[in-house]
Amino acid sequence: MLQSYCIQGFKSIKNATEVDLKKTQYQTLEKTNVCNGILKGCMFVGANASGKTNLIEPLRFLLMALFAVREMKWKNFLCLFSDADMFENTYRFLIDNAEIEYTIRYQNTDKLLVERLVLDGKVMMERTGATAKSKITEKKVFNGIPNEGLFLRDLWFNTRFRGHEVLQKWFDFLRASQYVNMETGLMMSFGEDQSLRIEKYIEEHGINEINQFLDECGFSFHLIHHPERNAGETGFGNLTVKRDGIMLEIPM
């Protein structure tokens, strides 16, 4: 699970800012919202343009750089309000009671990309510019690394971290992640065969759980699925909404 992350000079976050998901002594939701001492989720509350979106952007950035985009335009993530001309993101995870820390730092002045992977206090990989040292692979020193991509991404694609079970489980966890932005409608899956489209979910699970959720939350309508109809490009073509007490079904 994600334990914490610290960002500096990234997007609108000028100063070092840490988001810590380790639980405190608050016990009201401990049975359902805490796992192994870490919160399962959190919510950011603040005024418009206060930086809420950019606080979670580092998570999408990490997943994009590892699984989706091979050549990143690092300078696009620099904070416009900072004179440092660099950003640094550090992510900490707890996987099978092992602590993993991964840092990405980009210095725009020298076009220098730095990566550092630490497992339970032991440096497993360290990259500075085009050179890297690794304890994950048989080959210990690498040269000529392209500046546009993460070296950790290449290590995983080439080795799948053979012989390092904790790192394998860490990447399985990351690849199971999904990004949903309800404001822009952007949805992203980073693993294989992970579709966020509603027709795939209904095909596999039906609509009973969805309607049960609507009942539990006190909504006065239900979904009706018409499998004989074409779902269409939106995925909603074979779904209708029926309000309680009204015979008419409304297409979604």
Q: What are these language model-derived features?
A:
Residues K14-A16, E99-E101, M247-E249:
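Short, mixed charged/polar active-site loops
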Residues M1-R60:
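Pre-Walker A-like glycine/lysine-rich segment at the N-terminus of P-loop NTPase domains
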Residues S4, E18, E88-R92, E101-T103, ...:
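Beta-strand secondary-structure signal
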Residues G41-A49, E233-M252:
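Conserved ABC ATPase signature
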Residues G37-M43, A47, I56-N108:
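Conserved P-loop NTP-binding catalytic core
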Residues Q8-K11, L94-A98, D120, D244:
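Short strand-coil-strand connectors
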Residues R105-A231:
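Electropositive, glycine-dotted interaction segments
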